[in-house]
Amino acid sequence: FLGAIAQALTSLLGKL
């Protein structure tokens, strides 16, 4: 579950 959150955060950071 936490892995999914970390992956989502990484995706958002990548869009910046």
From Swiss-Prot:
Keywords: Amidation, Amphibian defense peptide, Antibiotic, Antimicrobial, Cytolysis, Fungicide, Hemolysis, Secreted. GO terms for biological process: defense response to bacterium; defense response to fungus; killing of cells of another organism. GO terms for cellular component: extracellular region. Expressed by the skin glands. The modification Leucine amide is found at residue 16. The keyword Metal-binding does not apply. It is found in: Secreted. Antimicrobial peptide active against Gram-positive bacterium S.epidermidis ATCC 12228 (MIC=8 uM) and against yeast C.parapsilosis ATCC 22019 (MIC=64 uM) but not against Gram-negative bacterium E.coli ATCC 25922. Has hemolytic and cytotoxic activity. Belongs to the frog skin active peptide (FSAP) family. Temporin subfamily. This is Temporin-1ITa. It comes from Rana italica (Italian stream frog).
